[in-house]
């Protein structure tokens, strides 16, 4: 069994509707259990900033799917929401990223291949990822720092 923290975002159309629909699909998947969502919050765009605000959050789930299989599943959810990858960091109906993954013993996984990088390479630099992650995993530390300490650094 694997444990995942998946960031979720949308900034096109019915933002919360896309997120809710994908959440329900994830809950109903036979290989996924114990799906929990953080609070959804409105945030400013990151990277490419000439676009609408986002609704962002974080999902926790447990699954028998390995990280590459989970990536395939969340990419299917994005596709069902009409996701098109036209501009890097550009507008999207639904954006799902595996932020953290843990194995059945609770060890954090580290993957870096052509299809998947876990932990997500930018998660530690994005407050819109860290705030909802803190809601679901308040004791998390990375690079000898708590989420709150990192958020304080990012706000300086």
Residue map of PLM features:
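N-terminal beta1-alpha1 ligand-phosphate binding loop
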Residues: 1-32, 37-44
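A structural signal for short, well-ordered beta-strand segments
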Residues: 8, 37, 57-59, 96-100
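Short, structured patches in soluble enzyme cores that scaffold and shape functional sites
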Residues: 8-10, 63, 134
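Short low-complexity stretches enriched in small and charged residues
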Residues: 9-19, 50-58, 84-85
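A broad, low-specificity signal for short, low-complexity segments enriched in glycine/proline
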Residues: 16-24, 58-63, 88, 92
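Short, charge-patterned binding micro-sites
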Residues: 36-62
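Flexible, gly/pro- and Lys/Arg-enriched active-site loops
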Residues: 46-54, 65-71, 76-156
């Amino acid at each position: 069994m694997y444990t995942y923290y998946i960031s979720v975002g949308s900034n096109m159309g019915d933002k919360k509707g896309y997120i809710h629909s994908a959440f329900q699909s994830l809950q109903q998947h036979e290989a996924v259990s114990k799906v929990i969502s953080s609070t959804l919050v409105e945030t400013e765009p990151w990277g490419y900033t000439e676009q609408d605000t986002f609704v962002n959050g974080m999902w926790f789930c447990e699954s028998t799917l390995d990280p590459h299989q989970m990536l395939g599943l969340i990419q299917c959810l994005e596709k069902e929401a009409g996701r098109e990858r036209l501009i890097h960091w550009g507008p999207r109906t639904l954006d799902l990223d595996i932020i953290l993954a843990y194995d059945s013993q609770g060890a954090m996984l580290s993957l870096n291949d052509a299809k998947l990088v876990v932990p997500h390479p930018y998660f530690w630099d994005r407050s819109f990822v860290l705030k909802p992650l803190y809601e679901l995993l308040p004791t998390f530390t990375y690079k000898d720092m708590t989420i709150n300490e990192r958020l304080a650094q990012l706000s300086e």
